[in-house]
């Protein structure tokens, strides 16, 4: 911003700093407030509901201004971050009272959506990931980190599809990108209101080199270096807690795209946008924040390695079999605080005394947790017990040094225990003795003057003084005191002896406070040196917490251990239940169902009425698969499952109206993801494909998709449909079987059995469902009449056919017989038209030609 001739030195300083952060709100510290100026003030006042005022109001060009108190700044920063903005925190770097000229100021941190480490209530079990994407000739190098926990991972993705899946899985709010980025890539990355932050090319940093030293892929190392450079530029402090980058491959886990995650309500309810009534909420009996975060990661990335799955299952079984040991473990875990984020605050330099007490309390639980592990049978627990480091030296240091109930502030004293430092104790003794001297002086002055209400007080303006009420002033001996201040009802006095003692007290107090802060910083640095040990312990405790959670939920919900097999794709689930629906309805009200798909069945074609449970049945299988491959027990009587590599879904009319995509377009995009990427080891759930377009278009597409999946993909597929004509495909597709959700009519009413039965449904019961929905009786009667007429007119064919024509209700007595293909050229032409091979445009042109011929007649 160009300098104005009328700018004050302070505004000149502000503008120079603001020019370095043009895309951020600059919170400029002045005394006890952070001030916003110019456009920041105008926009900030609106977003933060602040009073907009002005600096130099009487000038021709007053400067818009708004401010927030320094003690409440974080809440205002959080609001701006939630709106997707960045905030630069500009602090006074020297005491204004001691400054010569302008107070020095500098930005100490740039807070961004991906780097905000302030954890809101209710978000302790969530990660805040910042990601980095670096395009290259063969794909995209991709890294992500959680600044609050130190987690850092990296991979190399070969396609936009894979990149979009990773971004959706991490729910990232900010992506760091290089300066050279195509418009196409930028548009893709911005989807979902993500913030793109450009990191210019820079020399590798020592921190970036350290965390990337184990990486062998140059592209992965480069994207990690870019991300670390951005974090150093924004955080402007130690990042010692950021762990060495771990390379991973998404293909090593069960992959799900954004549609599958949304449709299955794994981590977030697709209807409410919240955690409630999700698979995560159901399985979350974790006792620690870090355990809750790891549970999310396990559900988001189920395993493919059958041996690794078996290890988790064995551990869950062992905890399930040892109720009392599990209860003791849970009791100890409830006293373990968030070790990952405590380590992060230590590295950042923001840890306070209470944080250290939380750390000590957590570490004090480890010996008892080790004892529990020693009582369990599984060998992995005994190995974990021997590897677990209780970090007792850190716990002992904090126990010796920090007050059990310390203040929040680290600069005002009261932090360090007596006995930890001899010099500090001497300062405290001096203060204590001096204060005792003052108490004795007060008593002696009362005796000498006879004024029993005489008091020695202290304030920051006058220091120590003697206060005498006006009614007792005549009792003071002449020349005994020096008058300092006159009040309405009292006089304040000092003596040379009192001021001398005051100097000693204040010097001791100031020295004591300064020494305490120095000692605290030294303690913090000693803890900081052990961050890697604390992070290793946190990972072990997190894993234990998730395993006990799986065991607890399995016991409470009557889950069974699934059998996992490799080599075949057979599915054998007996008495399966949808875990979330069962939880909502209650176990006694839920009707279980089997899913049997052996080597001779790749596809179940599901028919039945609306609201009968087709979608629930399909989701049920997918959730059982996810739970099993995450290592959890599952809601079933028996579950024998293969290892699935991917899950694809098309469930519900998830219109993307904001992006101008219709229901049918969403259907086709989601279907195409499965058709393009599924393998024989994938699981596909398609619900009502084709309903978003004209009847025969939809039926034709549905049949073509079924045939393609059956003949070319060979994935296990559950395909529900209202096109009953498609059920005849079982005659020509050897590995397709029909099943339906049972329903019966009783006294004209429809009763859903919610039970899956072999064979196709005999009808859809659509009018009965409309009756349940409360449609008017006259309307339902009319619909029933039309339905019977349509059924009477429809050709008796088992394959998809052209839509039946509704005849006029009143016909001429002398009406000519209907033409047949033998005597009608148009009908002959229509009969020969290959609907399955035609595109929608071909069909429209064909109908247009027929209309022209008919109009000529």
From Swiss-Prot:
SUPFAM superfamilies named in the record: DNA repair protein MutS, domain I, DNA repair protein MutS, domain II, DNA repair protein MutS, domain III, P-loop containing nucleoside triphosphate hydrolases
GO CC annotation: cytosol
Gene3D superfamilies reported for this sequence: 1.10.1420.10, DNA repair protein MutS, domain I (3.40.1170.10), MutS, connector domain (3.30.420.110), P-loop containing nucleotide triphosphate hydrolases (3.40.50.300)
Keyword list, A-Z: ATP-binding, DNA damage, DNA repair, DNA-binding, Nucleotide-binding
Domain of life: Bacteria
Spans traversing the lipid bilayer: none
HAMAP family reported in the protein's UniProt record: MutS
Name of the protein in its database record: DNA mismatch repair protein MutS
